[in-house]
């Protein structure tokens, strides 16, 4: 069964519900300020309790966990100011799954403030329906028990289950606030490497609105209305007979953003089980190499740069391209009559030169390709 939890590349800053990992049922007492008079109860609570999503607060109201002036209430009830509200904070099912589980983690960097981890393909980031155990969050809680006191165990952005690569995790609440702010301000640099179907003809920018697919609620899609702005910069590293090796830089972090954008550009990622094209014409050897990826798409979060929350310095990290994607690249290069002996990122950079991705801007592109849905 397909996982509908959308454990993916989006940022928690987009849909924050920052409950503590160790959340237990407790009560909160509030007084409605006069400046919120005239507002609905659910809207007033959303302003008074910004750490919880409005949908979650609405559910608590309907379940009787919100008492106004000693009486049950409804989400649409109007407030006049001065009401006494008691909220029983109930742990969500996902928070009950926030338990430590020892697992081998590829820690790229760690200090007293942050952890940078290289997530393998196949590992879900966060407990959700269909994946309540064995997630990266569970492993982080075992590795660093104090993360139980940080909302979402310090996780501020996500990668899809079948996407590998770098993630940063906050070890303190101030660090988490800093990283969330950086994500919201789009100052965190995230560079992905991917193999796309077809000959990608451009270096440029894909800019759309992304929302739920109106025809399939288990997928995301480019939509005309009701979506969120999404911007991906694409650079072609190498072209083969029927595929391209590309680098994608995110300005925003929407659900399945790169996968949806490359599908919109008619160049879905190789091996993508949701947005890909399993009938993409290519040689038998390449088909076998794509199959060897298993359930994962050829997408890897290769480079991550952000301002360190404590030192204020810009820090950058890289995670080598995984063996399965390198095998696919070698097969593609061999089929195209190119040198297929490159076995790691250092050899790739020695042969082709290392690009300075930290200085990317729109002027770097030969052609700017913009897909805008208004």
Curated annotation (Swiss-Prot):
One of its GO terms (molecular function) is 23S rRNA pseudouridine(1911/1915/1917) synthase activity. The keyword Translocase does not apply. GO terms for cellular component: cytoplasm. It is found in: Cytoplasm. Pfam families: PseudoU_synth_2, S4. Residues 8-17 have a biased composition (Acidic residues). GO terms for biological process: enzyme-directed rRNA pseudouridine synthesis. Keywords: Cytoplasm, Isomerase, RNA-binding, rRNA processing. PROSITE patterns: PSI_RLU, S4. Responsible for synthesis of pseudouridine from uracil at positions 1911, 1915 and 1917 in 23S ribosomal RNA. PANTHER family: MITOCHONDRIAL RNA PSEUDOURIDINE SYNTHASE, RIBOSOMAL LARGE SUBUNIT PSEUDOURIDINE SYNTHASE D. This is Ribosomal large subunit pseudouridine synthase D. It comes from Neisseria meningitidis serogroup A / serotype 4A (strain DSM 15465 / Z2491).
């Amino acid at each position: 069964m397909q996982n509908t939890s959308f454990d993916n590349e989006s940022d928690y800053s987009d849909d924050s519900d920052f409950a503590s990992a160790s959340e237990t049922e407790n009560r909160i007492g509030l007084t409605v300020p006069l400046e919120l008079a005239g507002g609905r109860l659910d809207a007033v609570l959303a302003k008074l309790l910004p750490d919880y999503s409005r949908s979650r607060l609405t559910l608590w109201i309907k379940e009787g966990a919100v008492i106004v002036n000693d009486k049950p209430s409804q989400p649409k009830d109007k407030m006049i100011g001065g009401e006494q509200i008691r909220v029983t904070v109930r742990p969500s099912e996902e928070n009950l799954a926030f338990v430590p589980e020892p697992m081998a983690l590829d820690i790229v960097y760690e200090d007293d403030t942050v952890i940078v981890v290289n997530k393998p393909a196949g590992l879900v980031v966060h407990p959700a329906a269909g994946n309540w155990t064995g997630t990266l969050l569970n492993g982080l809680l075992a590795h660093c028990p104090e993360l139980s006191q940080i909302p979402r165990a310090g996780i501020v952005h996500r990668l899809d289950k079948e996407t590998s690569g770098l993630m940063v995790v906050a070890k303190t609440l101030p660090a988490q606030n800093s990283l969330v702010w950086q994500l919201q301000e789009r100052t965190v640099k995230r560079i992905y490497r991917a193999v796309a179907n077809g000959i990608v003809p451009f270096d440029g920018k894909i800019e759309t609105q992304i929302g739920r697919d109106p025809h399939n609620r288990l997928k995301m899609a480019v939509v005309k209305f009701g979506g969120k702005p999404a911007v991906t910069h694409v650079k072609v590293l190498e072209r083969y007979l029927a595929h391209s090796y590309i680098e994608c830089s995110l300005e925003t972090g929407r659900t399945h953003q790169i996968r949806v954008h490359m599908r919109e550009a008619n160049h879905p990622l190789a091996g993508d089980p949701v947005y890909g094209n399993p009938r993409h014409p290519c040689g038998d050897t390449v088909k076998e190499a794509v199959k060897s990826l298993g359930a994962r798409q050829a997408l890897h979060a290769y480079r991550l740069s952000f301002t360190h929350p404590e030192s204020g310095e810009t820090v950058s990290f890289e995670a080598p391209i995984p063996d399965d994607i390198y095998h696919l690249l070698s097969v593609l290069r061999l089929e195209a009559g190119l040198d297929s002996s490159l076995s790691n990122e250092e050899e790739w950079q020695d042969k082709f030169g290392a690009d300075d991705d930290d200085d990317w801007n729109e002027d770097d592109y030969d052609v700017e390709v913009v897909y805008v849905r208004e």
